[in-house]
Amino acid sequence: MAKVDKDEFNEMIFTRINNLISDYNLIKENELIAVALSGGKDSVLTLHALKRYQDILDFDLVAISVDEGIKGYRYHGIDAAINNAKDLGIELIQKSFLEEEGFALDDIYSNFKSACIPCGVFRRNILNKTAYDVGADKIATGHNLDDEIQSFLMSFARGDTIKFSKFGPELDVIHPKLVPRIKPLWNTPEKEVGLWTVLNNIDIHLEECPYSHLSLRAKIKAFLNNNEDVYPGLKNNIMESFQKILTFENDISTNLNECELCGEPTSSKICKACEIKQLVSQDCESHVCDE
């Protein structure tokens, strides 16, 4: 295996990220960018990359971490988030399912086919509300090239063509209360993200979520990784094909309302977060849950 020069690798990966930000105008001068910081490799690289990009453009950064309430798992990620934010001098806002919603993921996941369903809904909801409350112009997530391919294939397999509009390095404003999102690692392969953390001895959360193996994403990820080993370049070919056949216009025809219960943006009368909370409440009542 060829030896990798750390300085050359860092220059390559940060140049790619910088070019993506510049080419798509992901960040504008004087904006406040909220980084969704889980403590995993992708979100940590996103934080470091945007901190470096402040040498090129004048904008502000804040980080937001969300503790889903997964026993024996999440606290490692929170520690990594705290350490990286502190090292870079970036404010970290810590939120949790328990404080914001009244329960931990461990308390409710058995009500669903996959724990990823309530987790994704509440995590996105908390991130958006927190970013909105601090006046953030955009939320930067750590979605990498592999994540993007997986998401597209998941939507394709489910026939959910509406989500095709979410493919791309940015999501525009579609409602005043929805903070638009950007993906600085959109064209960066997951393996390179991992290599960056190793070469630079970065403190990250290494464990896989104990619930992730049950998801469709995990199965698609395994399929892609197995075939990438046999057919090198497969992922890049898929990504290039997506870029050729899709436009990145966020053509979301659904008109968003405000949830009748919480006031958050939704395409229905009641948002998914409130629907899930009602379901959890009903299940709790049927089992005579403790106060």
Model-identified regions with their sequence ranges:
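Short Cys/His-rich micro-motifs in 6-15 aa windows
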Residues: A273-E285
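ATP-dependent adenylation/nucleotidyltransferase module used to activate substrates
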Residues: A2-S165, N187-N200, C271
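Short, basic, helix/turn surface patches
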Residues: C116-K129, S165-H175, E228-K244
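Catalytic subdomain that performs nucleotidyl-dependent activation
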Residues: D146-D229, L234, C289-E291
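Short cysteine-rich clusters marking metal-coordination/redox-active sites
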Residues: E258-C262, C271-C274
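Cys/His-rich microdomains that often coordinate metals
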Residues: L92, T266, Q278
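Short, flexible, mixed-charge glycine/proline-rich loop motifs
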Residues: K244-N255, L261-T266
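Long, charge-rich boundary regions
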Residues: L32, Q54, E285-E291
